[in-house]
């Protein structure tokens, strides 16, 4: 429909995320299984900060303060949306590192990230059937926060 009006739809990869983060809706927060499933579906649709903020406000109004695991679930959904817009297909955490699979592998953009002080000595390109970039986690770093920082840095490189 957008193409008929001469507007190109936003090209976005779907991103999956597998991080070592406690991200769920506990029964003690939302007792009804039906309501929990409905909220899980709503969270899965989050793609932007404003959508996350609106849902957080609604959840607080309906069920009270968010448990950390619900907040983490929303942050993972937001990460997936941001990463998809940045052209990242998959984010996983293994053996003290985050692994990012890119939709379009562009070594020039990766090189620009290598030059940033916070990534010096921590980024590595892994060749294989699916090229990927890994980011070594620092001790006591939070994987979700590190993933969001990388996605933001990567998306800024993509827009230049």
Kindly give the residue locations of the regions a language model identified.
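Accessory helical-bundle/CTD segments and flexible terminal tails appended to RecA-like ATPase motors
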Residues: 1-160
């Amino acid at each position: 429909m957008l193409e008929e009006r001469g507007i190109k739809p936003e090209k976005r990869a779907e991103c999956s995320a597998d991080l070592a983060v406690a991200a769920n809706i506990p029964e003690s927060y939302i007792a009804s299984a039906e309501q929990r499933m409905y909220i899980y579906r709503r969270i899965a649709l989050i793609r932007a900060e404003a959508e996350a903020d609106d849902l957080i406000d609604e959840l607080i109004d309906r069920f009270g303060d968010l448990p950390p695991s619900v907040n983490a679930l929303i942050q993972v959904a937001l990460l997936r949306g941001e990463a998809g817009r940045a052209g990242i297909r998959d984010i996983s955490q293994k053996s003290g590192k985050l692994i990012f699979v890119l939709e379009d592998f562009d070594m020039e953009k990766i090189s620009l990230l290598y030059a940033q002080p916070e990534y010096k000595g921590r980024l590595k390109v892994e060749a294989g059937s699916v090229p990927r970039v890994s980011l070594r986690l620092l001790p006591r770093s939070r994987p979700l926060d590190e993933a969001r920082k990388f996605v933001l840095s990567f998306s800024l490189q993509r827009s230049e």
